[in-house]
Amino acid sequence: MKISCFLLLVLSLYLFQVNQATDQDTAKCVQKKNVCYYFECPWLSISVSTCYKGKAKCCQKRY
């Protein structure tokens, strides 16, 4: 029983992987050392572009 649960866990982790750097806008954001957020940017950050094909915001620190 333990082995079957472990195999199911490994299989589910393998099938549901998320590759975050697949989009061109996401790669540009990460290369500029900015951070992608699906919701609003944090308090001391501004939105400079988009990530994940326009679904998220690329946020840059203000200081």
From Swiss-Prot:
Entry's localization field: Secreted
Keywords associated with the record: Antibiotic, Antimicrobial, Defensin, Disulfide bond, Secreted, Signal
Transferase found in the keyword field: no
GO MF terms held by the record: CCR6 chemokine receptor binding
Superkingdom classification of source: Eukaryota
A Gene Ontology BP annotation from the UniProt entry: innate immune response in mucosa
The keyword Signal is annotated on this UniProt entry: yes
Primary localisation category: secreted
Signal peptide start and end residues: 1-21
Covalent S-S links between cysteines: 29-58, 36-51, 41-59
Pfam annotation, one family: Defensin_beta
One cellular-component annotation, GO: extracellular space
Entry similarity comment: Belongs to the beta-defensin family.
Function: Has antibacterial activity.
PANTHER family: BETA-DEFENSIN 38 (PTHR21388:SF5), BETA-DEFENSIN-RELATED (PTHR21388)
This protein's name: Beta-defensin 38
Organism: Rattus norvegicus (Rat)
Species lineage: Eukaryota, Metazoa, Chordata, Craniata, Vertebrata
